[in-house]
Amino acid sequence: MLKSTHLQKILIALSLLIAAQPVFAQGSPARPAADQPYAVEYYYKAQWGHQQEFLQLFLKNHYPLLQKYIETGRVVSVKIEQPANHMTEDARWDYRVTIRFKNSALATTDDPDEARLIKQLWPDQAAYQREEQRRFEILLAHWDLPVTDLTPKK
């Protein structure tokens, strides 16, 4: 009887190892090639009652910079979205901005021309700084999520 129980344990352990093999084979998520577009989703959660103010400030003081990045080739596309339905407060986000960069290197490094572009786009730097400060004052949360497109190619 002792041998039978020991053999059963070995068979169970082997069965578990065989069943778990596909899990171990999955590995980490696919990463885009260095020369491929790289997408990041930026989520914004504003204070209740200030969502529209946040969006107006974003469109006035940040979106033009993103458009400049499209012109220079740093960014491929920008998409601004909001959810169609309500969520629980802990899961709530008000705006998602998806930016497709030309490649991962451009997405993860600062633009050396950013300060110059900001001064060019907003000559009244005092007003720009004041409005940007306000935009971040009414922001409750912000997080970035790099995403990988896994859609099969035809």
Model-derived segments and spans:
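N-terminal secretory signal peptides that target proteins for export/translocation
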Residues: 1-7
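Conserved long hydrophobic alpha-helices within structured protein cores
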Residues: 4, 14, 72-75
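Residues at beta-strand starts and edge strands
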Residues: 8, 36-40, 93-95
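A cross-kingdom feature marking solvent-exposed beta-strand/loop segments within repeated
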Residues: 81-86
